């Protein structure tokens, strides 16, 4: 019997959609509320996005604001800021979303 080549299915994901969600959460408390009600860190395909969302979720649960500074500080406290792309990547996520409605659409 001949063996067939097996190609595993890739999980559905869009790095751009994930970045849109992160950018929207950083800019809009309404988008943040929707994201935290709907998503968990495990819903993100990239490890970097999982870690960023997890840091955001930690801040949210503690009742802290979510913005570039607080998320950057939380990631720094965890020792993961550099591994997720640093402050520059967080800023890129914000700039990637021209309106938070786009990020909300991807939740």
Model-assigned labels for residue ranges:
Residues 1-104:
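Noncatalytic partner-interaction/assembly domains of nucleic-acid and motor enzyme complexes
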């Amino acid at each position: 019997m001949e063996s067939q080549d097996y190609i595993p299915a890739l999980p559905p994901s869009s790095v751009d959609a994930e970045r849109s969600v992160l950018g929207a959460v950083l800019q809009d408390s309404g988008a943040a509320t929707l994201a935290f009600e709907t998503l968990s860190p495990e819903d993100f395909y990239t490890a970097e996005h999982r870690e960023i969302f997890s840091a955001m979720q930690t801040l949210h649960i503690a009742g802290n604001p979510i913005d570039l500074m607080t998320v950057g500080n939380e990631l720094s406290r965890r020792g993961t800021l550099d591994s997720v792309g640093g402050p520059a990547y967080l800023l890129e996520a914000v700039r990637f979303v021209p309106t938070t409605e786009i990020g909300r659409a991807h939740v």
